[in-house]
Amino acid sequence: MLLLGILTLAFAGRTAGGSEPEREVVVPIRLDPDINGRRYYWRGPEDSGDQGLIFQITAFQEDFYLHLTPDAQFLAPAFSTEHLGVPLQGLTGGSSDLRRCFYSGDVNAEPDSFAAVSLCGGLRGAFGYRGAEYVISPLPNASAPAAQRNSQGAHLLQRRGVPGGPSGDPTSRCGVASGWNPAILRALDPYKPRRAGFGESRSRRRSGRAKRFVSIPRYVETLVVADESMVKFHGADLEHYLLTLLATAARLYRHPSILNPINIVVVKVLLLRDRDSGPKVTGNAALTLRNFCAWQKKLNKVSDKHPEYWDTAILFTRQDLCGATTCDTLGMADVGTMCDPKRSCSVIEDDGLPSAFTTAHELGHVFNMPHDNVKVCEEVFGKLRANHMMSPTLIQIDRANPWSACSAAIITDFLDSGHGDCLLDQPSKPISLPEDLPGASYTLSQQCELAFGVGSKPCPYMQYCTKLWCTGKAKGQMVCQTRHFPWADGTSCGEGKLCLKGACVERHNLNKHRVDGSWAKWDPYGPCSRTCGGGVQLARRQCTNPTPANGGKYCEGVRVKYRSCNLEPCPSSASGKSFREEQCEAFNGYNHSTNRLTLAVAWVPKYSGVSPRDKCKLICRANGTGYFYVLAPKVVDGTLCSPDSTSVCVQGKCIKAGCDGNLGSKKRFDKCGVCGGDNKSCKKVTGLFTKPMHGYNFVVAIPAGASSIDIRQRGYKGLIGDDNYLALKNSQGKYLLNGHFVVSAVERDLVVKGSLLRYSGTGTAVESLQASRPILEPLTVEVLSVGKMTPPRVRYSFYLPKEPREDKSSHPKDPRGPSVLHNSVLSLSNQVEQPDDRPPARWVAGSWGPCSASCGSGLQKRAVDCRGSAGQRTVPACDAAHRPVETQACGEPCPTWELSAWSPCSKSCGRGFQRRSLKCVGHGGRLLARDQCNLHRKPQELDFCVLRPC
């Protein structure tokens, strides 16, 4: 009756997307030369030393030959296990023998096969062969003491296959949302098909990938933590079980389909014997992840050079984890957090040996990989099959290509962008540590108990090696249930056969060796990214000569090279607009779907406040506002990184180039602004201003063509706020900086017809305005003096081109040496202006009256008279065109509210609140009482927030 119920419900419980799994009892045969083909039950790692081993497993009408060697790659030299909390009965510390348990290899000499097994306590682990996965584990009495063992060494082999067609749309088993973020968009941008539009006359986009273009081995130093529920469930076998999972995950990351040499290295295992020893674990996956991340951060070492420092941490628990909408969640991690000590972590719900795939999946998220079904992936690569590692359902894995093209592209971009630099430090020395197939260690019954709890048994009539169906109870009746994973690799599926990659395979072709990858020849250079003005061409090579196989190393070294092309200036460059300006202008009229901007918005490049890492993004500001956005993840190749730099952007990375536009060139502008010049084609102009009047004072007029401009205003007695501020006007008299009695306290970049001037802001003891390249428009420098009228000290210098045929005899040398004139008089090092005779009458201005406003926009007046040489008033005698102004704007800036960032939300779900602090800040950064700021315009200090529904 019980059997009938199982049969009925096994068919009723079948889900779309795959047939029932298969299983078979097998007896592994060791075929080493010293064994001579007899049936042999593995006693332990001491039997072989460091020699290779060969096992034959016959199952599912096939022979599987596992050619195994010790594998040391997934355990660090300083690997250790630590127990925290009160010891549990029956649990002992890890044995050093575990270091020699794990082996890896291949199956039947298939290029895409793999084997990862443990040889301690029986043959247990997993292997993959011809698209199927196999899990092998000893039957219960097979791991008994030697005197009680089954003389035949019986093992259970399970297999599951790769789906041949659509698999339906099962619920996602991952707690990470299948959305996209700007980093994913940036990573996939090079793959996107280009449409006709902006830049075709001046640029042509290329297809391809890579930024830093170098394939470098990465070592992911990993902390593995098991909570109290894991300790109670697995007992003394826990450490071996965890390492079996990590061994399989490490093998997946060494597969060449990921296109990068990545090594998962375990540096420490922590076993938590009681709840108080570790982080708080609940059914809320997001909260558990947050608790674990904070907990592991406190335990980690400060220095990355410490042998027990970890780059990422993984928590395993038997707690049923729930995501935002379902409790089918098997894991959760924050996306793109590798090398972030506070957030590089993941949480895994243990459901048996398939947790190895969940581990690899969640680590993929930490490496910034999204799910394969995100819209951006599908737009670039088409609809991807649901049998890759980053499928949200994670039901079937294509062992021939476990990583999709989208995942490989994104992790490559992530590493090339510098986000994985903490992974470059290599463990101090290699240790020969084994790697095994999980099916060699765990029977089919044990796999069911690991997945569904004590007492769960394999369902009868399963198809070998495909989905693992196990018994359970629902509403008092016996049912068959599955988590859509196959039998563990290495599970026996017939005489001379075992499960591998979900299929039952035979053993043959034993002498299969590891193949390291090697670079193929360089492809030809692609098209130039621009038709003029300096573009870039790329050439790449692939790791296909040969492709890595059987756990071999991925290629190391430069994978993409580049060169400059089409360096002749563009005809439209006379307009003075830079190529970056044109790229921003292409978005004019696009209001970014926000009501802050109108459809008439005009976009200009943003330079100030942009971090060096973001210089090759197209960051544009809405002209006349403070709003700015990333309008494109990368500028067109060949765009200057900044107006005062000769470096250019290549695939989103700033690459050094010469002033001639050639990548790798060492040519530089001299102080005259001449590319490759010798500093002899210009003359230096210097000056000093020290005696101002209240308001704006003329300092110097800088002609067009001036270069190496350096203007400095040193604060009175070293003070930061001495009430003297540099100001700048263009040739039309429009203020470009600190006009109308409004000054900038922060650093700013001013772009004037393509030339960049860097302003230090007023918050420094030495206020400066500098430009290295020649300016294309005459500018006027002034100094604004207010307040206590402390004397300014403005020094300026710049270089002007020499006259082509300058007659030095017409300018006799001043016996006093180079002239340095003061107070608003332009001076040349080889020329002195003679003062004009004083006219008989001149304008005389009185002192300024009080300001009409205490702060903000006020006015003040003064008397202006025309007086003769004797001081009498002679109104008609003065030139009206030179009459001084009688009225001017005045008033210091009013105190303003200074805001801090919002605090985190007080609740992880549901309605919470967040705060921020307010300060009333006066002119010069002085902290004032709140009532001195406009209370009617006081920003909000407290607000409600909802991170997600509970």
UniProtKB/Swiss-Prot annotation:
Name the record gives this protein: A disintegrin and metalloproteinase with thrombospondin motifs 15
PANTHER family given in the database record: A DISINTEGRIN AND METALLOPROTEINASE WITH THROMBOSPONDIN MOTIFS 15, ADAMTS A DISINTEGRIN AND METALLOPROTEASE WITH THROMBOSPONDIN MOTIFS PROTEASE
Domain notes: The spacer domain and the TSP type-1 domains are important for a tight interaction with the extracellular matrix. The conserved cysteine present in the cysteine-switch motif binds the catalytic zinc ion, thus inhibiting the enzyme. The dissociation of the cysteine from the zinc ion upon the activation-peptide release activates the enzyme.
Tissue specificity as recorded in UniProt: Expressed in fetal liver and kidney, but not in any of the adult tissues examined.
Annotated propeptide span(s): 18-212
PROSITE patterns, A to Z: ADAM_MEPRO (PS50215), TSP1 (PS50092), ZINC_PROTEASE (PS00142)
Native organism: Homo sapiens (Human)
Disease cited in the entry: Arthrogryposis, distal, 12: A form of distal arthrogryposis, a disease characterized by congenital joint contractures that mainly involve two or more distal parts of the limbs, in the absence of a primary neurological or muscle disease. DA12 is an autosomal recessive form characterized by congenital contractures, primarily affecting the small joints of the fingers and toes. Additional features include knee, Achilles tendon, and toe contractures, spinal stiffness, scoliosis, and orthodontic abnormalities.
UniProt entry keywords in alphabetical sequence: Cleavage on pair of basic residues, Disease variant, Disulfide bond, Extracellular matrix, Glycoprotein, Hydrolase, Metal-binding, Metalloprotease, Protease, Repeat, Secreted, Signal, Zinc, Zymogen
Residues that carry a glycan: N141, N591, N623, N679
Enzyme class label: hydrolase
Taxonomic path: Eukaryota, Metazoa, Chordata, Craniata, Vertebrata
MF terms in GO: endopeptidase activity; extracellular matrix binding; heparin binding; metalloendopeptidase activity; zinc ion binding
Ranges of compositional bias, category Basic and acidic residues: 802-816
Gene for this chain: ADAMTS15
Function: Metalloprotease which has proteolytic activity against the proteoglycan VCAN, cleaving it at the 'Glu-1428-|-1429-Ala' site. Cleaves VCAN in the pericellular matrix surrounding myoblasts, facilitating myoblast contact and fusion which is required for skeletal muscle development and regeneration.
EC number: 3.4.24.-
